[in-house]
Amino acid sequence: MSNLIISKKNEVYLHVDAEPHVYYELADQFTFELPDAKFMPQYKSKYWDGKIRLFNTQNGNIYVGLLDRIVQFCKDHEYTYEFQESEYYGLPFEVNDFISKEGVKDYMFSICKHSPREYQIEGVYDALRHNRKLLISPTASGKSLMIYSIVRYYVGRKQSILIVVPTTSLVEQMYKDFADYGWDVGSYCHKIYAGKERETDSQVIITTWQSIYKLPRKYFDRFSVVIGDEAHQFKSKSLVSIMGKLGDAKYRFGFTGTLSGSQTHKWVLEGLFGPSYKIIKTNELMKKGHVASLDINVLLLKHPPTRFETFEDEVQYIIGHNQRNNFIKNLALDLKGNTLILFARVEGHGEPLYNLINSNTVINRHVFFVHGGVATEDREQIREITESESDAIIVASYGTFSTGINIKNLHNVIFASPSKSRIRNLQSIGRVLRKGSNKTKATLYDIADDISYKSRRNYTLNHLIERIKVYNEENFNYDIVNIPLKK
């Protein structure tokens, strides 16, 4: 008899039948310390030990998407295993051998006005062949075409499809992309976000997760396909809850431009969607000419040495620094082309920056202010206006414009607020990489601050070091320019 007998409980969980000592070894293998746990209230109040446990020793359940990891565990520990077929859910591991790469290529060419690239065909082929996949593909690599191709495939097989995105803008954008590819999108797709009807007979639903995560399990019963765009956000409890309610969704596909770099993050997402597959890297897209080439100028503002007791003290100093804000204003007004300025705090930084820039610009030059309180329709209108402009400035919060918004005619991005988040930084860079009709090059201006006191580096300077690590990992070209700044 095998050491582990693995079966499907449903399309969310596997059940592992094994001896208690194997359960404890599996628990060790699939337990991780969350990198940011020490900052969380539950950890500080000692209600939680800061660990994520992906294997449940009480019932033997683990996410279906981690099957490959379990098989590797068996090999490493020299355990035997076997798959047991479920009457309703079938075998834990299935491969669709009838799907060929040539067939996928022909199909993608037949359903779209745009010619798919080789790596897009590879990604769709790998996804359809294995039923579930976490596809890692950077901004401007054509994720929406891959999603569209998968959607069309399952629509043709009469399956109900749920597409989950993080923002209302992305609901509208994906709907428009599908129409742009030549599909009669109105006959098949229904959009859900604030104020939209949730009940529909449409075969495809495109929705924000915020609109559906509180709905009962029964609502999700009809879906056999789930697609998560910007899947790196699916580690949150609300999104995990949605995926857990999709007990009959056999086909699961997550799309993201980047992961956080932590093993915990990757394994949770693989558990929800399936094994990860890296389609292509940004620097490869640049070499092939699919995206604009990128120059990064790190503008390191040198402040008088100052010691801050807390991170918040330093942030308040930075965002309220008049010379720093004037420097950003002058930079934005002097740059040629359309410019996106990203900030973290609306009232404390975004609004003062917008007022400063808008009051000093020439007449008829568009300066836009975008944050969470701006309606989706207004954001879309700003995007469309910018596409036809040559010197527009958008002052936007990271939350609204760092993820998924497509503006081809965008030439410059300014990081006005410090951030060490790998995902946020790479997604923000992605905003400027799309090629336009007269655009082949883009520039990122990374505003950083050296306020070091004696041998002690300031908090946000450490954030810059984390960003530079990312630039090196992605093989981006960057220069660091020191700029003295008076108090």
Locations of regions flagged by a protein language model:
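Conserved segment of the helicase C-terminal RecA-like domain
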Residues: R431-I465
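A short beta-strand element within the Helicase C-terminal
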Residues: F223-S224, A396, I405-P418, Q427, ...
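Conserved helix-turn-beta segment of the N-terminal RecA-like "Helicase ATP-binding" lobe
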Residues: T168-Y193, N360-T361
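Conserved Walker A/P-loop ATP-binding site and its immediately adjacent core
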Residues: S144-D180, R345-E347
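Walker A/P-loop
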Residues: R129-R152
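Conserved interdomain hinge at the start of the Helicase C-terminal
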Residues: T306-A344, G348-S359
